[in-house]
Regions:
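Short amphipathic alpha-helix used as the core "switch/output" element in two-component signaling
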Residues: 62-79
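Bacterial C-terminal helix-turn-helix
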Residues: 134-172
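Two-component/phosphorelay signaling modules centered on CheY-like receiver
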Residues: 13-32
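Active-site beta3 strand of CheY-like receiver
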Residues: 46-57
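C-terminal output helix
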Residues: 110-120
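Short hydrophobic/Thr-rich beta-strand motif most characteristic of the beta2 strand and flanking loop
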Residues: 27-36, 42, 62-63
Length: 172
């Protein structure tokens, strides 16, 4: 079974080519970009299941800060799309920062093809599990509100939450 669409963002054309070959048997569609600044527009036009994001784009800079900035941007704009970070300049602190900023996982270059594919599949599967839990919660909340004949205060009381979080959950 092939997964949907992956967006790979890396400034190195050779890396993009290698990843297209490596991931061709796993994904239906592989979109590539040499820079992350065009990704927000692309993400509005193309449905994407996962993003593989390099962490460094400026010549001579290998701190990973650019990747962290774009990771936070993608998480803010498209929280449902998992982002896996990839870099040749990895250290434990950078990986921790990436995970704390919302990355689904972290891969180092050079990568092992099987490990990369497994990591991407796992990230997609985990993101779909979260959506399922949210849909279960939403269904339950709507049933309680219906049972309370639309009385939000009573529904919040039965759910053990205050009205404000209940309103937020109903908006989703």
């Amino acid at each position: 079974m092939k997964y949907g669409t992956i967006l790979v963002i890396d400034d190195n054309p050779s890396i993009l080519t290698a990843l297209k070959i490596c991931l061709g048997g796993t994904f239906e569609q592989i979109l590539t970009l040499p820079r992350p600044d065009t990704a927000p527009t692309l993400l509005q036009q193309e449905p994407v299941d996962i993003i593989l994001l390099d962490m460094n784009f400026s010549l001579g800079v290998n701190s990973g800060q650019e990747g962290l900035l774009w990771l936070r941007t993608f998480r803010r704009l498209h929280a449902n799309i998992p982002v896996v970070l990839i870099t040749a300049y990895a250290d434990i602190q950078l990986a921790i920062k990436g995970l704390k900023s919302g990355a689904a996982d972290f891969i180092t270059k050079p990568w092992d093809n099987d490990e990369l594919i497994r990591t991407l599949k796992d990230a997609i599967d985990r993101s779909q599990e979260v959506e399922t839990l949210e849909s279960i919660e939403s269904t339950h909340i709507h049933k309680v509100v219906d049972q309370c004949h639309g009385n939000i205060s009573r529904a919040a009381e039965l759910l053990g939450i205050t009205r404000q979080p209940l309103y937020a959950k109903l908006k989703r």
